[in-house]
């Protein structure tokens, strides 16, 4: 699966961007934390699209600085509307509450539990421990770490292979681009690609280039 992040500041622009992105991608990620303001009605509109809804907290590299209880309630709105995925941080103390809420109401939403390190890639053992913690909470484990060398790539590829089909593993930065290209082949459920030069993280490959590379690798 290819996922294109939607990073607009205005909800109407975000919905238009999603429609364009879905012409070339399988799914979009609405970065709701990047909106100038976000309410339940906005979440309901986003949930109608094949999407991941992410309201990334500022302490995990996002831009949401509002009340955390409101953030959790917005996630619950996404779950009530059966959005395909939500992405909640491993460090968020209320992540289990969202899983329990999903289970209680019988929502079809899958919960991605994520970890980010914008400076380095931890050891393979540490990455595996992170993934194990994430899978004890949610449906899909995600890690995005800064890749600085070939050893980092090997660690990332190894962990993706171990948890094939229930993981999103990403190496950020220029060195990490290779993980975005072949991670899906090794077992990552999706990769994030940019569109028209707009990206949400360092190292995202343009969607058109990514598809051309995949064609060459067939």
Swiss-Prot record:
Primary role: Involved in the third step of the chorismate pathway, which leads to the biosynthesis of aromatic amino acids. Catalyzes the cis-dehydration of 3-dehydroquinate (DHQ) and introduces the first double bond of the aromatic ring to yield 3-dehydroshikimate.
E.C. no: 4.2.1.10
Residues the record marks as active site: 116, 142
GO terms for MF: 3-dehydroquinate dehydratase activity
A biological process term (GO) from this entry: aromatic amino acid family biosynthetic process
Protein name: 3-dehydroquinate dehydratase
Keyword Amino-acid biosynthesis: yes
Taxonomic source organism: Methanococcus aeolicus (strain ATCC BAA-1280 / DSM 17508 / OCM 812 / Nankai-3)
Database matches in CDD domains: DHQase_I
Involved pathway(s): Metabolic intermediate biosynthesis; chorismate biosynthesis; chorismate from D-erythrose 4-phosphate and phosphoenolpyruvate: step 3/7
Gene coding for it: aroD
Keyword Amino-acid biosynthesis: yes
Keyword terms of this UniProt record: Amino-acid biosynthesis, Aromatic amino acid biosynthesis, Lyase, Schiff base
Subunit architecture: Homodimer.
Protein family: Belongs to the type-I 3-dehydroquinase family.
Catalytic activity: 3-dehydroquinate = 3-dehydroshikimate + H2O
Positions that bind 3-dehydroquinate: 29-31, 56, 180, 200, 204
